[in-house]
Amino acid sequence: MLVTTSRKPSAKSRTLCKLLSRFTASRCISRGKMGMQELLDFTEGNTFIVVGEYHGNPGELSFHDNEGKLLFSIRFSDRYSEEIDSYWFPDVLPVLTGEGEIAEALESFFHFERVESDRVVQLPQNSLVMAIGDKEIDFMGSGKSLFKFNIKGFKKY
């Protein structure tokens, strides 16, 4: 899987692209002037996420299949914890927890293991957890919130 930016990304969008790629064990590229066909060639038949912007800040994630078809998008505002600067991402795949349409869409896209919310505390200390609700997505590492998306909108295509 690949995480990439919009065509002329801000520094904040590049930072989010890197964070998402490390959290999901994916590759990250700054797209630059790369068109959609070049991007599809670069993904080598894998799915990809495009980090879009709103007023110079990351504000939308567009989830595409291996043929470039837009599957769904999430509009959001983001918040980062102070822990993120010193956090070392372990070499493990995250697990998902949560219910609802957004959780279902993310599970089908990422294919990460899904756990019940009451089992999250039983996971190993170095686990990465994507806790998905109707209004926010919390990206947690080692039991602490690293960054969050406040969801502004969700659309399936």
From Swiss-Prot:
Keyword Lyase among record annotations: no
Record domain Brix: where: 1-157
Q: Does the keyword DNA repair apply?
A: no
Q: Name one GO biological process term.
A: rRNA processing
Q: Which domain of life is it from?
A: Archaea
From the UniProt record, which GO molecular function terms apply? rRNA binding
Q: List, alphabetically, the Gene3D superfamilies matched.
A: Probable brix-domain ribosomal biogenesis protein
Where are the membrane-spanning stretches?
none
Tell me which UniProt keywords the record has, alphabetically: Ribosome biogenesis
Task: Say what the protein does.
Answer: Probably involved in the biogenesis of the ribosome.
| Protein name (record) | Probable Brix domain-containing ribosomal biogenesis protein
Origin species: Methanosarcina mazei (strain ATCC BAA-159 / DSM 3647 / Goe1 / Go1 / JCM 11833 / OCM 88) (Methanosarcina frisia)
Lineage per the UniProt record = Archaea, Methanobacteriati, Methanobacteriota, Stenosarchaea group, Methanomicrobia
